[in-house]
Amino acid sequence: MKTRSKLAAGFLTLMSVATLAACSGKTSNGTNVVTMKGDTITVSDFYDQVKTSKAAQQSMLTLILSRVFDTQYGDKVSDKKVSEAYNKTAKGYGNSFSSALSQAGLTPEGYKQQIRTTMLVEYAVKEAAKKELTEANYKEAYKNYTPETSVQVIKLDAEDKAKSVLKDVKADGADFAKIAKEKTTATDKKVEYKFDSAGTSLPKEVMSAAFKLDKNGVSDVVSTVDSTTYKTSYYIIKVTDKTEKKSDWKSYKNRLKEVILKDKTSDRAFQNKVISKALEKANVKIKDKAFAGILSQYATTSGSSSLKK
């Protein structure tokens, strides 16, 4: 839910701001929302009060993206897909799902709309990425591609322990595989891996170190930091086999296709470019200065003015 909420946070404020904005078009801005002795709070009063808040800014952005992508790609995401994603998340949270929704400021329907908008944007980005499957991009991906490498890995949690184990595995006659099985602190005790440069089974630093080694070569201690827990782990790698890279990029076309699509769809700049084009196609214009900057992250050199005013 956390990932999807980045795209559509603050649905409750969205409901208030968007609804009141709509109401102001149907009724007078002076319509009373609250009355009290000696004073009143009008639609305009409330709108002016909340529209500059961070939640309202995010909510208006969400509403714009929802409308634009639903208009342009609405038939590409079915209610069934949305429900499946919703139910999967609900199952993961179990009995705490309702509480999680409430804490996120979401209703069930609001969260489903959030999921739908995210899926629509993802679809648009994937379709745009497919257009990047050019021969030039295939050749560029091939230059940076390393075919399958087989390794044995020892994972350790302490640097001093890693240095001690490194001495053991580099000693004459050392049985790396045996030491790896005895010393690794990996929860699954796995020590044998195969991967190419597009793999994700091990940290990038570990794979990069492996690619630099010759067959039967043993690395020094390689440290990595988990981006989620910020915990440092230490690795010692031995390469047991290396696949020679073929000279024709077409030999790896299917794998390179995966690489290109993954790189593009995960690239924030590319995502923003796709969203920018959709906004320009919809001729989105911001009429209230309070929201003038909410689309600035999607503004491009051409057409940026239409996204700002």
From Swiss-Prot:
Location(s), subcellular: Cell membrane
Sites of N-palmitoyl cysteine lipidation: 23
Keywords: Cell membrane, Isomerase, Lipoprotein, Membrane, Palmitate, Rotamase, Signal
Signal peptide as annotated in the record: 1-22
Main subcellular location: membrane
Top-level taxon in the UniProt lineage: Bacteria
Name recorded for this polypeptide: Foldase protein PrsA
